[in-house]
């Protein structure tokens, strides 16, 4: 794989422009490892509320290892271990798990937890919260659940034109972490036209990984005839990457879960293929796409890097405590009298 310089070469013979950063973000990596470590520490089954991350390959691999995915905590046997997904949960879900005596491991992404804390603080300070996000998404449900009497959901820029608030001087916007940056800023612009005193969150709610992947695919799309985004249909950030690619110059863009879904007709007359992946996609799936494209004559892979990522999150505290306790038990057991 050749590294790409500042300027992408002009279209020519068959090649792949591989976006970087791509794939797993720190929050997804932490959540997946949390389930794997829980299975290792407690043994199967370990229950997970909702999909741990929005990727069918990851979910099926964890199921193979002994994870059981459920929609709600009342499906979990009393006293069992349950992992809350990276998208976060409401206080009501936490309480329901406690009522069943479940041993909960909270794998909520710390960047989502940050939004939860913002919602609690602004609600406490008597602000109305305009939450920009997609109705029905687990992350939105979790955030809204932290301030249910104060949150109004804004699904799109058009909805910003019709939202009503009680006090336009005490209103703040927050957002789902996986949205299109451009669309979110357009929504905020239109909200501020109606509510000039609209407050911003203390820091960006859209996560670094979502932003970085969108910036990279914008660069790639400018020179691509076709863009392939690896990611699942229910992955908000993967779907947004397809939209961004089309907005920034790609002649066509498609989302696939696996390389086997790439259609030959997509490649007809195509010289440059852009490739990226959503934040919940393991790199092995991208490599399978590259291998498939190489077989079709696209063996020249040029990486388009727009940012470096080195953020890492520690495991959930509940898991760290149990793992540390197990080490202490082993240490004590190994001492000679």
From Swiss-Prot:
It catalyses: isopentenyl diphosphate + 2 oxidized [2Fe-2S]-[ferredoxin] + H2O = (2E)-4-hydroxy-3-methylbut-2-enyl diphosphate + 2 reduced [2Fe-2S]-[ferredoxin] + 2 H(+); dimethylallyl diphosphate + 2 oxidized [2Fe-2S]-[ferredoxin] + H2O = (2E)-4-hydroxy-3-methylbut-2-enyl diphosphate + 2 reduced [2Fe-2S]-[ferredoxin] + 2 H(+). The keyword Metal-binding applies. The active site is at 139 (proton donor). Pfam families: LYTB. It is an enzyme of class 1 (oxidoreductase). Dimethylallyl diphosphate binds at residues 54, 87, 137, 235-237, 280. Pathway: Isoprenoid biosynthesis; dimethylallyl diphosphate biosynthesis; dimethylallyl diphosphate from (2E)-4-hydroxy-3-methylbutenyl diphosphate: step 1/1; Isoprenoid biosynthesis; isopentenyl diphosphate biosynthesis via DXP pathway; isopentenyl diphosphate from 1-deoxy-D-xylulose 5-phosphate: step 6/6. Its cofactor is [4Fe-4S] cluster. (2E)-4-hydroxy-3-methylbut-2-enyl diphosphate binds at residues 54, 87, 137, 177, 235-237, 280. Its EC number is 1.17.7.4. Keywords: 4Fe-4S, Iron, Iron-sulfur, Isoprene biosynthesis, Metal-binding, Oxidoreductase. One of its GO terms (biological process) is terpenoid biosynthetic process. [4Fe-4S] cluster binds at residues 25, 109, 207. Belongs to the IspH family. HAMAP family: IspH. Catalyzes the conversion of 1-hydroxy-2-methyl-2-(E)-butenyl 4-diphosphate (HMBPP) into a mixture of isopentenyl diphosphate (IPP) and dimethylallyl diphosphate (DMAPP). Acts in the terminal step of the DOXP/MEP pathway for isoprenoid precursor biosynthesis. This is 4-hydroxy-3-methylbut-2-enyl diphosphate reductase. It comes from Leifsonia xyli subsp. xyli (strain CTCB07).
